Amino acid sequence: MQFLSDTQRMVLSRAVCASFFFFHVAVAAYTARVQEMAMRGFALRNFQQVHAYFEQHIPLLSSFTEKKEALSLFAQYLELHDAHERAAHRYRDAALYALGTERVQFLLEATRNAMAADAREYARETLAEVEHIGVQVLNKKQHATFLVYHVWLALHAASTAAHLHEQLERLEEYGTQGVFNVFETVLLFTRWWITQDEKVAQRLTERYPQSFEALSVIGAVEIAPSVFWHLMPRAYGEAVESMGKSETVVLQDAKLRPVPEVVAAHRTRRAHVAADGTAARSAMSSSHNLGVSILEGGVSVPDEVGAGDEKPRGYQLGFFRAKENAQRLMDDLERRGFGFQLHTVRRADAVYYQVFVPEDDSGFVGHRLKDAGYETFPLF
């Protein structure tokens, strides 16, 4: 039996995802004009052309419904191609033309994509807009999602061990409440990722042995950069060990968790999940506010492609424990005509090898890599 290479599997996975996406477009209940736009746009050759087509034609739509549908569709396409920051902007644009829970859902999708792009300030602004709408508008699963996203952002912003400990306690509390049941694997994984607590790992692997999170803990699968890379805090070590003992331990010099080698299998697992039941906590109180101003005017569609997006200096394609695995990836990149660099990263526990592909003036190297079947993580 002949087995597919990692690259072939990634290409096949992307093709299957794209086929499903286009099938969804064909049968979805979009307006006729949006369906026509979708079929014309997605028939183009590559990401750059599709991106330019939608940016040009969406402003020409006349009705709010058409603009909402087209922006949502475009956002889904951008997300499929891991252009998460651009997807966040388009989801938030779609929210301008929606009401009630539909508007909230677009804003939550925007927040999730902003976190995946490490655009944390934009994620906070978008989540603050959800708060401004009012908790009474949110349905149960949206409320639970809102609270979890708030904690993830607070974990990212934690500057002391005490602040980190406060958010970890909140995650532990959520894990005891029914409304967060479907979040339990990612909540446990978050706690394990930061603290390396073996009791948390045991609970995760015993309760959910076939979950991606449990399989990742035991090393059976590894985490692709587009999934948990940004959503999970990376500070640990002495600062975490000091939690609860000191109010002044600063995390800015804390070690960074070494990131496992990348495999494509984990890419489809998203941190955004739904929950049913009743939320046990109220919306954020004033003492837990996001510390950002509420956007009153919304967001407009940029005139330029990618306007407002920070251009990455390049892309990490792998973070390997074994140098020979990094070499195989570099050989494949060379055959496909990509430039690359190998960086040696020394951690307290081991040496890791980072394969890095620099961006060029076009700004589309990342999408060329995606089209070639590679998983990437932008570095700014």
Swiss-Prot record:
GO terms for molecular function: peptidoglycan binding. Residues 1-28 form the signal peptide. The keyword Signal applies. Residues 307-380 form the SPOR domain. Keywords: Signal. InterPro entries: SPOR-like_dom (IPR007730). It comes from the Bacteria. This is Uncharacterized protein TP_0752.
